[in-house]
Amino acid sequence: MTFNDKLQAYIQLTRFDKPVGIELLLWPTLWGVLFAAMGQAQQQGAGITAGLPSLSIFVIFALGAILMRAAGCAINDFADRKVDGHVSRTKGRPLADGRLSAKEAIAAFLVLVLLSASLLLFLPIQVFYWSFGAVILAFIYPFMKRYTHLPQVFLAAAFGWAIPMAYVAIQGAPDIWCWLLFLAYMCWTVAYDTQYAMADREDDIKIGVKSTAILFDRYDVIIISLLQTLFLVIMGAVMWHYFAPTSLGITPVFGLALVAMMFAKQNSACASRNALACFKAFLANIWVGRYVFVLIAIACIWTTFNG
């Protein structure tokens, strides 16, 4: 293989050529950063109701999300290297078609984890301790689909772990609102990753891979809808907590109505159980992440300067 061929294989291994996954991790991480900064400002009292995170914190967590998502993809392909070749959507992955070896995938995972760890040098030491949870969850998640029908829960925990880390970095420790935000993220992630699994359900059944799509069976869309509803309710409560004391009041909460409409459209598509329709519904969640980030960011900026 030429250098360019090998480089392309590594890019595909880490999914840098497919930014959808990056966004699904990046935006919720930044939700956590923004809310943690709001909480820190409100804890100071003296009538302060809002605040923004420092640019350095923002950049560190954004880079960390990008690198750890890439690391997660590398270890996922390592875990699935013997089954990806039997799934039409994944048979072209670099480990499945032999362009990269298992050792090269592990090496890529370790390099990306070390690069992510280097960012911790600029954060309080407590964040370093919390980061072990992220690494452990990212490593074990890909293997869970062999033993449980709930690998999506492990994925959600692995990707969502950046939220308590953001609170530790900014506030010193996670609080109840941090964990509610984490729970909301878990609900949303299990919902959209079930949509993703619905696209592969027939192949997964044939090769013995487990997923929530298989577990939920004909109740899949109903349970996805319930999880999305929980996300909206919990996220609404979190927004109420942070923005009710400000000049905006509960106005940002009403902004979640558009998310509800997005979810309704997704579920209408998934009701057909068509693999392509389910995959497109999954992809549509990047707009949920983007929109909620913009909603929170605008509210935080407005309240920081207008009270």
From Swiss-Prot:
It comes from the Bacteria. It is found in: Cell inner membrane. One of its GO terms (biological process) is ubiquinone biosynthetic process. Its EC number is 2.5.1.39. Pathway: Cofactor biosynthesis; ubiquinone biosynthesis. Keywords: Cell inner membrane, Cell membrane, Magnesium, Membrane, Transferase, Transmembrane, Transmembrane helix, Ubiquinone biosynthesis. It catalyses: all-trans-octaprenyl diphosphate + 4-hydroxybenzoate = 4-hydroxy-3-(all-trans-octaprenyl)benzoate + diphosphate. GO terms for molecular function: 4-hydroxybenzoate polyprenyltransferase activity. Its cofactor is Mg(2+). Pfam families: UbiA. It is a multi-pass membrane protein. GO terms for cellular component: plasma membrane. InterPro entries: HB_polyprenyltransferase-like, Prenyltransferase, UbiA_prenyltransferase, UbiA_sf. The chain crosses the membrane at residues 19-39, 48-68, 105-125, 127-147, 150-170, 172-192, 221-241, 243-263, 282-302. The keyword Transit peptide does not apply. Belongs to the UbiA prenyltransferase family. Catalyzes the prenylation of para-hydroxybenzoate (PHB) with an all-trans polyprenyl group. Mediates the second step in the final reaction sequence of ubiquinone-8 (UQ-8) biosynthesis, which is the condensation of the polyisoprenoid side chain with PHB, generating the first membrane-bound Q intermediate 3-octaprenyl-4-hydroxybenzoate. This is 4-hydroxybenzoate octaprenyltransferase. The lineage of its organism: Bacteria, Pseudomonadati, Pseudomonadota, Gammaproteobacteria, Moraxellales.
